[in-house]
Every structure is written in structure tokens, then in C-alpha cells.
Design a protein with these regions (language model features):
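Short solvent-exposed loop/turn micro-motifs enriched in small/polar/acidic residues
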Residues: 1, 10, 55-57, 97-99, ...
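Active-site or ligand-binding cleft "flap/edge" segments
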Residues: 1-19, 63-73, 110-111, 116
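Aspartyl protease active-site motif detector
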Residues: 4-46, 75, 93-95
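Short glycine/proline-enriched turns and hinge-like loops at secondary-structure junctions
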Residues: 20-21, 57, 86-87
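Short polybasic/polar patches that bind polyanions
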Residues: 34, 65, 100
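C-terminal reverse transcriptase regions that engage the nucleic-acid substrate
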Residues: 43-58
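Glycine-rich flap/beta-hairpin and adjacent strands of clan AA aspartyl proteases
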Residues: 71-125
Length: 125
């Protein structure tokens, strides 16, 4: 499991983001979702996150810029993700599925992201 923290841009605003390969899905807090179109899934989604079970009935499409690279991915909206070890609130938890989709690899020894596998185009079969 690898974790990297850095800011990404959502609608021109920098958002503190945790890239976590131990999390399957991507999550955003309501202040981030306010800049995005939120939809209501047909059922409540429950997820174990940060030692507790959180519920949501809101989802969004996260459109963001990571180190200048545009990304789009599905995200669940939850009231609170948690804080990092410095006490800074995490606004976005970027999960493993989205990292795989966008070719993002955490490099924990250097505390950075490797975007050398970012797809310039998608090839579908």
C-alpha cells in the first residue's frame, strides 16, 4: 500500500489530496463536490474508511488536473475523509481504480507521483 499527498486542481482550486493504493474508490468532501455536478445513486453506498463505516447517497464526476494532466473519474461524496499526519483535512481520496485508469503510480521513497504512464489516448478493443 502506497500513499502520496499533494494538491490537485479542481475547477481552478487547489485541493489537498491523498493518493492511496489501499483505497479502491475515490472520494471527495462536499466543499469539493460543490464545484462539480452531484448525482444521487439509486441506493445508499456504505464504505469502511478511516476506521469507521461511512454512508453516502451522492456521487460525482471528478474533473481535475494532476500536475497539468487532465483526469476524469467517478467519486463518492462523503462528509469527511479525515486528516493527514499534520492535521490538514484531506479533501480528496484518490483511489487505486482511478490511479490505474490514469497510469498514476505513487513513488513513496521520493514522496511523488509517477505520471510517465499517463495515457495520451485510450485504445479500446
Amino acid at each position: 500500500m502506497s500513499r502520496i499527498k499533494q494538491s490537485i486542481k479542481v475547477d481552478g482550486r487547489l485541493c489537498w489530496t491523498l493518493f492511496d493504493t489501499g483505497a479502491r474508490n475515490t472520494y471527495v468532501i462536499p466543499s469539493v463536490a460543490a464545484a462539480l455536478k452531484v448525482s444521487v445513486p439509486t441506493a445508499t453506498v456504505r464504505t469502511a474508511l478511516g476506521g469507521s463505516v461511512k454512508e453516502t447517497n451522492r456521487a460525482t464526476v471528478l474533473n481535475a488536473q494532476i500536475e497539468g494532466h487532465p483526469i476524469t473519474t467517478h467519486a463518492l461524496v462523503i462528509d469527511e475523509i479525515g486528516k493527514d499526519e499534520n492535521g490538514t483535512p484531506i479533501e480528496i481520496l484518490f483511489g487505486a481504480l482511478a490511479m490505474q485508469q490514469w497510469g498514476i503510480r505513487p513513488v513513496p521513497d521520493e514522496e511523488r507521483l509517477d505520471l510517465s504512464h499517463y495515457p495520451e489516448e485510450f485504445i479500446e478493443f
